[in-house]
UniProtKB/Swiss-Prot annotation:
Topological region Extracellular: 1-7, 68-81, 145-173, 246-257
Record-given protein name: Rhodopsin
Disulfide topology: 81-158
Underlying gene: rho
One Pfam family from the record: 7tm_1
Length: 289
């Protein structure tokens, strides 16, 4: 045990709570949206993709982490570590790139850089495919030798190897690639899109270019998507910051809890997306009732 054996009860209980809430909420989001035709809009396809990503994390990652927490170390071997790390990374990355697609959609629809553009089903499908391709370019390489998945923190869950310069895995190049392509670029895109979005909403309100009903509907959707992006950053920014700090200070000593806390905090992202979707979308609430 890396810490007091009693301490493993906390992550185990936390994972149980995330599974208890995350599975039914995300499954309900999928079921209600697919069941009601009026909810099957192109924009909601991307939101459904978020629910699928969260279910990957819940079923492929959280269940494994809860089981290993009960034993006090990662008992499932190399294959189990690869599977847990892959599903957790894949789910987080699908969610990240889905939010990128949503940000671009909001920017194009509200700011109108392309005149007479409509976000159609074909655009949504392209967005889904894009999010999956980008997610796989991050989750697959550690399985085939570019970096690797290893137990992290208290050794109850697995993640990308930020910690070592193990020969033959090229960890340094993969971590730099991951931070640039899968963190800084999406982050910059979202800041740009929402910066332009806020300006456009204010300008439209001042000029009264559209009807009050249209403006209100666009504001509600934009507010929901912004909330999702902010919540995503709140969950994943601490993990990314700590991981980068460890990567830049390899060889220094870090306590197991130092990486465990932000890693487990990041896992809560599987809950907030469907809750925001449900709480801020009156059509979804009405269909559930």
């Amino acid at each position: 045990y890396l810490v007091n054996p009693a301490a493993y009860a906390a992550p185990g209980a936390y994972m149980f709570l995330l599974i208890l809430v995350g599975f039914p909420v995300n499954f309900l989001t999928l079921y209600v949206t697919l069941e009601h035709k009026k909810l099957r809009t192109p924009l909601n396809y991307i939101l459904l993709n978020l629910a699928v990503a969260d279910l990957f994390m819940v079923l492929g990652g959280f269940t494994t982490t809860m089981y290993t927490s009960m034993h006090g170390y990662f008992v499932l071997g190399r294959l189990g570590c690869n599977l847990e790390g892959f599903f957790a990374t894949l789910g987080g990355e699908i969610a990240l790139w889905s939010l990128v697609v949503l940000a671009i959609e909001r920017w194009i629809v509200v700011c109108k850089p392309i005149s007479n553009f409509r976000f159609t089903e074909d655009h949504a499908i392209m967005g889904l495919a894009f999010s999956w391709v980008m997610a796989l370019t991050c989750a697959v390489p550690p399985l085939v030798g570019w970096s690797r998945y290893i137990p992290e923190g208290m050794q109850c869950s697995c993640g990308v190897d930020y910690y070592t310069r193990a020969e033959g895995f090229n960890n340094e190049s993969f971590v730099i690639y991951m931070f640039i392509v899968h963190f800084l670029i999406p982050l910059s895109n979202n800041f740009f899109c929402y910066g332009r979005l806020l300006c456009a909403v204010k300008e439209a309100a001042a000029a009264q270019q559209e009807s009050e009903t249209t403006q209100r509907a666009e504001r509600e959707v934009s507010r929901m998507v912004v909330m999702m992006v902010v919540s995503f950053l709140m969950c994943w920014l601490p993990y990314a910051s700590v991981a980068w700090y460890i990567f830049c200070n390899q060889g220094s000593e870090f306590g197991p809890i130092f990486m465990t806390l932000p890693a487990f905090f990041a896992k809560s992202s599987a809950i907030y997306n469907p809750l925001i979707y449900i709480c801020m979308n009156k059509h979804v609430r009405h269909c559930m009732i």
